[in-house]
Amino acid sequence: MNPVLLTRRLRLSDFSASNLPDLAKMNADPDVMRYFPQKLNFEESAELLKRIMAHHQQNGYALFTLHLTESDVFVGWCGLMVVPFEAHFTPAVEIGWRLNKIFWGKGLATEAAEAVLRLGFLELGLSEIVSFTVELNQPSIRVMQKIGMQSEPKDAFDHPKLPTNHPLQRHILYRLTKSLWLKQRECSKTP
């Protein structure tokens, strides 16, 4: 499959049916899924894959598979999706990522997310991209901060797809506008 994006260490490609075994294995890992309501079984991962592919068909973008460029090993996914629920910040496009745990702590989520932001702002013409996670998910929050996203306490929200008082209900919202992203790129070039 032809890559959509290449980074220093990663190849980002559109999902296909052939990615289901790798996706299902990752989604069944309790460590990978610890900040989600549940692990996904094979059938649930197949449904997720169908939604990802349908989103791409409808919107022209979705989540991408991540593979190491040197070895073609499946790392996880990263990409953009329209937020599928109503909240104070919707309609919105969300950036997200999920990596197999053997790739945690290596900067790969940040590397992929930076490429996806560039695609979202420069190729797709998005004016703002959001990301959100549960308050306990510090690894994802660190990635959001590393890629320049910002959070306001007033933007915290209870995820509408989780029951009241669910331990993962409270979420932190991060945002990044195209203008701020461009400004950050300009500042990073200054000596």
Tell where the protein language model's regions lie, with residue ranges.
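Short loop/turn motifs at secondary-structure junctions and domain boundaries
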Residues: H55-N59
